[in-house]
From Swiss-Prot:
Reactions listed under catalytic activity: 2-[(2R,5Z)-2-carboxy-4-methylthiazol-5(2H)-ylidene]ethyl phosphate + 4-amino-2-methyl-5-(diphosphooxymethyl)pyrimidine + 2 H(+) = thiamine phosphate + CO2 + diphosphate; 2-(2-carboxy-4-methylthiazol-5-yl)ethyl phosphate + 4-amino-2-methyl-5-(diphosphooxymethyl)pyrimidine + 2 H(+) = thiamine phosphate + CO2 + diphosphate; 4-methyl-5-(2-phosphooxyethyl)-thiazole + 4-amino-2-methyl-5-(diphosphooxymethyl)pyrimidine + H(+) = thiamine phosphate + diphosphate
Pfam families from the UniProt entry: TMP-TENI
Any one GO molecular-function label of the UniProt entry: thiamine-phosphate diphosphorylase activity
Name the record gives this protein: Thiamine-phosphate synthase
Organism: Pseudomonas paraeruginosa (strain DSM 24068 / PA7)
Annotated residues for binding of Mg(2+): 69, 87
Gene field: thiE
Example GO BP: thiamine diphosphate biosynthetic process
Amino acid sequence: MKLRGLYAITDSQLLDDGRLLPYVEAALRGGARLLQYRDKSCDQARRLREAASLRELCERHGAQLIVNDDAELAARLGVGVHLGQTDGSLSAARALLGRQALVGATCHASLELAEQAVADGASYVAFGRFFNSSTKPGAPAASVELLDQARPRLHLPITAIGGISLDTAPGLIARGVDLIAVIHALFAAASAAEVERRARAFSALFETA
């Protein structure tokens, strides 16, 4: 599967009160190719249950599930994992999950971190925040010039994250970004139908790029 398109990331606060599964399915119907389950709570039983349900939805829609910051849960479910810089060893996650698993790495605004992630076995790297982010307002800012430097040096998919909207995504795609990671601009919606409409709009940006 080529890693290109909309990368949907869940948020436990945005998707509470029973919204998680219907909103995620709407995003998948709208064309999301990757889904990251991001839940920082300590309720292991709920996290396992929700992640298993999301895996079924992804399989149904031809997408791939990635678990944030929990290689053991990812291994249990046979899915991928995304690791931040403080979330543990990327090479250990690769060894645990196997050669075929998707393993992503947060690299903030650092090309050096990205090159190290590649050496450690990452499937893709994520740069950002590119714009003001509701999820991580204190994250280091990344510039579009970083993408110009990264594209010729990194021979694997590049993800952009951080406050990205339908208005700002085209400029990032034009700079060679393969995946646009979105949380609020996708899931902060009044209905599942609106989530699907937004997902289709994001996905369409890659068809014209």
